[in-house]
């Protein structure tokens, strides 16, 4: 046999309470059930948890709506129905929000001023396994080798021969690498140079000397020192001179007095 709980506010006068009870019983649609009236906290405590198939209450404001939803959530069985009779729009909105926050589902508002909902068919703390991608913590060496092999096979399709990118001009003008001479901190030609570094240094010195002899200053500040020389000046790093390179400027330290 079904158990119906009728929640009536304890501060309602007796005639009004009887009217509310008739309204709540009418919501049960005449079902053959045992009716339990809840008019106080003691009545609510006497009712066992999850023992009701339906719970009906009347709410005059938001606080009564929240109290009714809290009691119904405790006393209703899974799948049980809750119906709350409201008087105005504000209370109806508050009741709807209270039902949702209490975890009820299928919240509907009827034209007769009753807000109905259903207690979900699961219990608190119910576990549910979610499908997720399994993480392989202990992968075998064979799996790792297969992964690297697949990666290498994919890379082979996109490899380009680097030699094919060089033109004939690039090959002919490639710099000569000298491997036989390594003296001191810097590389220079050794005494018995056989790798060609000595000849390259001699040719570079001759080229530098020839450029200095034929050099014509564009700014006219080459003799003044690095502070006045341009970025491409061949005399960068050399001391200031008078007219010809190599002629150092000497300061007269004599006493004029």
Curated annotation (Swiss-Prot):
This is Anamorsin homolog. It is found in: Cytoplasm; Mitochondrion intermembrane space. Disulfide bonds: none annotated. GO terms for molecular function: 2 iron, 2 sulfur cluster binding; 4 iron, 4 sulfur cluster binding; electron transfer activity; metal ion binding. It holds the Pfam family CIAPIN1. It comes from the Eukaryota. GO terms for biological process: iron-sulfur cluster assembly.
